[in-house]
């Protein structure tokens, strides 16, 4: 058993239980593996009105200094940042100053490992704490740091952080190509067994029946390209389908799974993804998926589920191909909880032997 201090920019909040659900899954898994985990949620200082800039920021402004999640305490530390980070050195200095508060919160408890989810800017604080406790530091990148951060004005800090941690973990092979010294440990699929369903062949009136489409994201997030999903539904309607489409606006996980059970197909139109966890959850819930060619989708989804082009017509063709198909879709073992826990255990053992 290891004592793990986990810092994360993304974590469920009292007013936003959907924020960072994939990080909460990892924390839960670590505890199931027998590790003792203490969680620090790094958040920017902001006014309530500024939450409207991005739906993922809902609940950030008024998040308490400390709260409980699944009966475990979570410490919130704040840093100062401006939109688009015009002063990255200011942000770095701001988050470093929170180290003392974290140390006071931990008291006599000393971590064997420091783990951080996302590099900018949480890894700056993680590195300082790892140095303070002489512990190895692991950084897990979910996509934004690489796909957006490497072209931002703080890219040099991200490159420096990536080189300074003892191990960089990425969640997909696509990200590993850009970070050659990383190891791939994907996010596992966390769907209760009682909610898991096999995918059944669609039964209905071809090009006349009703089609319930799930847009498995918050439609307000521009990178998810809700407009393309709407265009696809309009194209399906011109072919005779009666289409309804709904999204998932920051709702708890149980409601996500309920919506997946109620719909006929999930439609993913994102402009930027590393490995859409929601697509895997949909498959486990028995909901077929149609997607643009994004992230790692091609590595495990059958070809007929991937649109040949990023157009409403190509996506509508893929939707109809999936509805006709009788092919079963099986998730690879790498997304199973057992595989992920084994890979994490191997990583921890190797790093703790070195330290």
Predicted regions and their residues:
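Aromatic "clamp/platform" in nucleotide-sugar-dependent glycosyltransferases that forms part
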Residues: 271
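Conserved acidic donor-binding segment of nucleotide-sugar-dependent glycosyltransferases
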Residues: 304-313, 320-325
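Short hydrophobic beta-strand element within catalytic cores of glycosyltransferases
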Residues: 279, 288-291
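Conserved donor-binding/catalytic core segment of Leloir-type glycosyltransferases
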Residues: 5, 200-224, 230-233
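Short alpha-helical donor nucleotide-sugar binding micro-motif in glycosyltransferases
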Residues: 258-263
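A charged, aromatic-enriched C-terminal amphipathic alpha-helix characteristic of glycosyltransferases
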Residues: 199-201, 324-355
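Acidic anion/phosphate-binding donor-loop and adjacent secondary structure
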Residues: 149-152, 188-209
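N-terminal subdomain of nucleotide-sugar transferases
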Residues: 1-63, 68
């Amino acid at each position: 058993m290891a004592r793990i201090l986990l810092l994360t920019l993304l974590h469920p909040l009292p007013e936003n239980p959907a924020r960072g659900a994939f990080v909460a899954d990892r924390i839960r898994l670590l505890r199931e593996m027998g590790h003792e985990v203490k969680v620090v949620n790094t958040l920017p200082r902001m006014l309530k009105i500024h939450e409207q800039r991005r739906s993922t920021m809902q609940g950030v402004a008024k998040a308490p200094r400390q709260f409980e999640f699944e009966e475990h305490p979570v410490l919130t530390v704040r840093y100062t940042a401006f939109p688009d980070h015009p002063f990255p050195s200011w942000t770095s200095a701001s988050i470093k100053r929170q180290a003392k508060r974290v140390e006071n919160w931990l008291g006599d408890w000393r971590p064997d490992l420091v783990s951080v989810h996302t590099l900018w800017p949480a890894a700056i604080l993680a590195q300082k704490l790892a140095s303070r406790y002489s512990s190895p530091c692991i950084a897990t990148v979910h996509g934004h740091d690489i796909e957006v951060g490497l072209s931002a004005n703080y890219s040099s800090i991200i490159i420096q952080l990536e080189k300074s941690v003892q191990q960089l973990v990425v969640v997909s092979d696509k990200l590993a190509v850009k970070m050659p010294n990383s190891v791939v440990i994907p996010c596992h699929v966390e769907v209760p067994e009682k909610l898991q369903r096999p995918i059944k062949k669609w039964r209905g009136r071809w090009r006349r029946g009703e089609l319930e489409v799930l847009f498995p994201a918050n439609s307000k997030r521009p990178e998810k390209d809700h407009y393309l999903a709407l265009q696809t539904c309009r194209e399906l309607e011109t072919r005779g389908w009666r289409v309804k489409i709904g999204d998932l606006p920051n709702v708890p996980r149980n409601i996500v799974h309920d919506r997946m059970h109620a719909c006929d197909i999930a439609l993913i139109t994102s402009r930027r993804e590393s490995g859409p966890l929601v697509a895997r959850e949909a498959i486990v819930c028995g909901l077929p998926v149609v997607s643009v060619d994004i992230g790692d989708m091609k590595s495990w989804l059958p070809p007929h589920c991937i649109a040949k082009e990023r157009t409403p017509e190509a996506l509508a063709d893929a939707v109809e191909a999936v509805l006709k198909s009788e092919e079963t879709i099986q998730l690879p073992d790498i997304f199973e909880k057992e595989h992920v826990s084994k890979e994490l255990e191997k990583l921890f053992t190797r790093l703790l032997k070195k330290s």
